[in-house]
Amino acid sequence: MLHTINYRSWHLAARQLGRSTFRKFTTESSTKSPIADVCFAFDSIDGVLIRGGRGLKEGTKTLKFLQKNNIPFILLTNGGGMHESVRAQRLSKTLSVSLTEDDFCQSHTPFRALADKYKHVLVLGGKDNSVRETAEKYGFKSVINELDVIAKLGTPFWPFTSFNEEDIKDAKDFDVTRPIEAVFTYVDPVRLGLDLQLVMELGQSKNGVLGTVSKTANEGPDIYFSNADLIWPNEYPLPRLGQGAFAICCESVFKELTGKDLRNTKYGKPHKLTYDYAKNILMKKHKTLGITNPPKEIFMVGDNPESDIRGANNYGWTSILVRTGIFQGDNSPKYSAKHVSDNVWEGVRWALSKHVPAAKLNKSMGEVRGFHTSSRVLNTVTKSNNSKPIQRPLRENIFTLPNLLTFSRLLSAPLIAYLYIYDYTKAAACFFLYAGFTDLVDGYIARKFDLGSIAGTVLDPLADKTLMTCLTICLAVRETMPLTLASLIIGRDVLLVSAVSYLRYKSLPAPKTFRRFFDFAIPTTELKPTRISKWNTALQLLLLGLLITEPILPFDASFAKSPLFYIVGCTTIASGASYCISRNTFRNIGKSKLQ
């Protein structure tokens, strides 16, 4: 049974928010009227504004547009474990957008409305002291955590985990006879057994005093959970248990011990209390624009039907589902959104089109222009608390024009070698020129039209190395190229391909099968060519092109071959060494934990 929240707390929260200065929503005049009388809420973790720890250009563009046009928004997430000011700093850097703590509503942000209600509280979750520090910044006067308890009461309180001096170095002394008035779980517990023991003891205590037992088992402190998500996805191929699992453990064990239900309150999406708090912040921002009436419509943009869309629909907000995260498809059959778009920019454009004339909207946002589907990511898990998770590997769209050009260059390598060996020199030269052309344009197209992909960062150098290896062997066999130089070129490429293959195998999510290893739609390791390596590739292609096309050239090219042999030999050695000494040449892109 949920506690009834004292709505005076919301008033106190509004007063507290009022003490801080809200950022102006525009870099122009602060009195400029918004383009539409609406508000937005965005899921701020992977899938809407960022992906795999990197900012999406659609996300940056959207937030800057809303700020410029004085349209209030809030970043509403089930993540937590840190203060909103820390989260704002991190996301500001990731998105290159100026954000403040007032732009965020994390799963535990509504706890700040309860700071005046409780004098002495216990906080749970997280690895370090950040949860306690967050609670103190919210205004809680006396805050203890589980390590304070174990330091005070010793090993007998929880004998199944050993704690050393390093673990409890930040422990805070407290009066064990002082009643604990509330227990707050801010983020997924790291010490689940200890935290479960604490909740059980306090739930059965008399007035929240440790070491006491209530005869009625209903005199304990108020208990709060900030996030009821049962599971969540990370880089591991199967979902991990979340804070919701801890809440279920607490409820089940308490029921078994006492025969009664554990009284507790749950926050986070899709629960109404979190949306109440988020709406309170949006209304405060709305009033700073001098608009006293409520906004005509509030839109929620998310990638998770289970939490984002379900919560928005239940609360009466207009839901927009995007395909840049967990969800991929036409719409969710279980929790259908009012609108589905490829990305957040297109979703916001649709929302504003309901309130802004087309001509005015086109002037503000430009003509309708979609982003390529390669910006989409399929995540590892579709979450549902009521059904088994649908397991999918993290994948991306690899069938883009740059990748197809690169793949054609890869296939042309053995064909060029065959034609050259059997003296079809003109045909070999033509195909070589085609391969060189694709090498020039594929990268340009990827950058110009936002068609880049992780698979492309692997396929492009692989195609170059395959082409050069095939031709180098042919030229060495026909004694057109010195054997020493051919050995240098091939040896460097063999070592480089071996290193990439090894790192891909190590970072490939389970199961590590032969088929999945060669499935480049599953991104794992990104190879970033060094500058000297790019120069070396260009010089090698120049040398190979000269040697391949020499039989059909209208002039004698012998004068250029010897200098190129020496130059290419030196750059080959230097580029090989650069991969060994350069930082961030190989990057594991598979790890993108959702908080």
UniProtKB/Swiss-Prot annotation:
Transmembrane segments: 538-560, 564-586
Cofactor: Mg(2+)
Protein's UniProt keywords contain Coiled coil: no
Localization: Mitochondrion
PROSITE patterns xrefs: CDP_ALCOHOL_P_TRANSF
Listed Pfam families: CDP-OH_P_transf, Hydrolase_6, Hydrolase_like
Keywords linked to the UniProt accession: Hydrolase, Lipid biosynthesis, Lipid metabolism, Membrane, Mitochondrion, Mitochondrion inner membrane, Phospholipid biosynthesis, Phospholipid metabolism, Transferase, Transit peptide, Transmembrane, Transmembrane helix
Keyword Lipid biosynthesis found: yes
InterPro entries: CDP-alcohol_PTase-I (IPR050324), CDP-OH_P_trans (IPR000462), CDP-OH_PTrfase_TM_dom (IPR043130), CDP_ALCOHOL_P_TRANSF_CS (IPR048254), HAD-like_sf (IPR036412), HAD-SF_hydro_IIA (IPR006357), HAD-SF_hydro_IIA_CECR5 (IPR006353), HAD_sf (IPR023214)
Gene Ontology terms, MF aspect: cardiolipin synthase (CMP-forming); cardiolipin synthase activity; hydrolase activity
GO cellular component, one term: mitochondrial inner membrane
CDD domains from the UniProt entry: HAD_like
Family listed: In the N-terminal section; belongs to the HAD-like hydrolase superfamily.
Protein's UniProt name: Cardiolipin synthase (CMP-forming) / mitochondrial hydrolase fusion protein
Organism this protein belongs to: Schizosaccharomyces pombe (strain 972 / ATCC 24843)
